[in-house]
Amino acid sequence: MIEQAGKIALFHTGQTGIGAGMRGGGGVRLKYSNPMAVDDVAADFPDLDIILAHPSFPWQEEALAVATHKPNVYIDLSGWSPKYFPDILIRYVNTLLRDKMLFGSDFPLLTPDRWLADFERLAIRDEVRPLVLKENAARLFKLGAAT
C-alpha cells in the first residue's frame, strides 16, 4: 500500500532511549530494531523508498550495508549527537552514502541547534554538508530544486 501510494516508509532502527533502564526495558524488544530486518522489505518492495531512522546503534555497520546495497534505502542521522558518530559512519557520509544521508535531530530529545553545532565539528567534506542538511531530503521528498 505504501509503495503504491508513492509514500516513504520510515523504520526506527537501533537502540532507543524509550524503556532504557526500566524493568524489562519497558517491554521494548531491541531485536526488532536491527536494520537487517528492513533489508527484506527493501528487497520485496524495490520501488518503496525507505528511511532508516537513527544511526542504528549498535548495528551501524548493518545499516550502512543495507543502505549501500539497496538503492531505495536512506539513513537519517537523528537521535544521536554527531559527536558520538563512529569513524565508519563519517566515512560513509563522506563517500559511498553521501547522497543517502539525511539530517534529523529527533527533537525534543535533541534540539536542532545542538545537533547542527555538533555536526559542524565533524570532518564532513564541505561539498557533502549541503547534501546531508538539505539536498538529499529535497530530492527524496520530491520538493523540487534544492535551493
Model-derived segments and spans:
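Mid-to-C-terminal alpha-helical segments outside catalytic/metal-binding sites
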Residues: 97-102, 110-147
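Catalytic pocket-lining loop regions of alpha/beta-barrel enzymes
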Residues: 1-102
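Short, flexible micro-motifs
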Residues: 82, 107-108
